Amino acid sequence: MINPELQQYVEREILPRYDHHDAAHRRDHVLTVIGQSLAIARQLRQQGVDIDEDMAYAIAAYHDTGLCEGRDHHHEVSARIIRQDMELRRWFSPEQIEVMAQAAHDHRASSGHAPRTLYGRIVAEADRVIVPETIVRRTIQYGLDHYPTLDREQHYERTVQHLREKYGEGGYLRLWFDDSPNAARLTRLRQLIASPAQLRPLFDRLFAELK
């Protein structure tokens, strides 16, 4: 069970920050990452791994707070926010806070190195919300927010390029747990990416809903 005071603080002071992010990284996203992080942490505890669920919860809650300063270095900013938030010292030791900051820094899928700690692997895995329709939707949302001058065909080309670079065979996304449900989901997503006959109608429907 998460510390009630920590949860109240996060819900009051941290989660509202996501309401100002782009549509692909708002409150629904962070709540999903929190839920998946806790599910992974609890599964590991059942396997006998020593995991602090409060740490896993807080890391997930803070992992994208750095988007307030843009996307390119948001993982670094998120780590800084954790280190500078004096309220976290009510619940965590300096050593725990440093582990949490490192985990937030390491969560980004496009980072060139593996997460340094188990907590980094947890939030990185939880951040891979591999539900094919959700992935395509979030990709379109990001494109509409950040490239508003593109027309429909250009958005489709950008979507396909991003999906291939991140999720395709040889893409930069990595999964950190062999028994992760994301493994089967990634296989289904790759099948979708490889099939324009399936991907294009899905794109057209979602684009019309979001435009």
Give the label of every model feature segment:
Residues 51-70, 74, 78, 99-109:
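His-Asp-centered metal-binding catalytic motifs of divalent-metal-dependent phosphohydrolases/nucleases
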Residues 21-32, 66-77, 94:
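Active-site metal-coordination segments of metallo-dependent hydrolases
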Residues 79-116:
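Hydrophobic, well-structured mid-protein blocks that either form specific transmembrane helices
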Residues 19-49, 62, 111-211:
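Divalent metal-dependent phosphate-bond-processing catalytic cores, especially two-metal-ion Mg2+/Mn2+ enzymes
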Residues 33-38, 73-88:
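An active-site-proximal "capping" alpha-helix that borders the catalytic cofactor pocket
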Residues 1-16:
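Short alpha-helical hairpin
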Residues 8-12, 27-35, 54, 59:
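Short amphipathic alpha-helical segments
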